[in-house]
Amino acid sequence: MDDCAYVTWSTGIGVGLCVDGHVLRGKNGNAGHAGHSFVVDDQDALCGCGNRGDVESLVAGNAIARRFGHDAADWLGRASAGDAAAQENVDGLCRILGRMLYNLVATLDLQRISLGGSVFWHHRAYLLPRLQAHVQAHFPALTQGVILAPAGLGDRVGDYAALALVPD
């Protein structure tokens, strides 16, 4: 697959990009910091990088604990079990991350986004259809056929990704 991304949803939001069959690194090696992009206007959420209201400040695991008073695992578990308040909050998280995913698809014409990270991985059955719905809700000419899927390497994907970047 020549045009794809890996998105980690964990204590931060990170993205690895492959465009035209090549890893996209950027001028300073910082391509993929989409977690520091803005998709809503929320100046109350402070990110570790100093931004206010970026995606990471709103949906990362530590942001969930800060915003909702529950750690991510507990809050997502409650949402999965049917807790209405947790479901409403998690739907909001998926809307924010879904917008970021859509922006990646719209900007880079991606075929596939593989998802991983501890927040996503442990609740993937609940989160994946919600994220897919948010991506597919916009501009079908761009999003039709785009695949969102759990990372095939599971919770080891970060290890392999780091090894892939080691120079020969």
Name these PLM-found stretches.
Residues M1, G12, A31-A34, G145:
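A structure-centric signal for secondary-structure junctions around beta-strands
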Residues D2-D3, V23, D41-C47, N51-D168:
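ATP-binding/phosphotransfer module of carbohydrate and carboxylate kinases, centering on a glycine-rich
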Residues Y6, I13-C18:
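Short beta-strand scaffold segments in enzyme catalytic cores
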Residues V7-T8, K27-N28:
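Short Gly/Pro-enriched turn/cap motifs at secondary-structure boundaries
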Residues S10-G12, V119-F120:
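Short glycine-rich anion-binding loops that position phosphate/pyrophosphate groups of nucleotides
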Residues G16-D20, L24-G26, V39-V40:
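Short beta-strand-to-turn element immediately C-terminal to the catalytic PLP-Schiff-base lysine
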Residues N30-D42:
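A short, polar/charged loop-to-alpha-helix boundary motif
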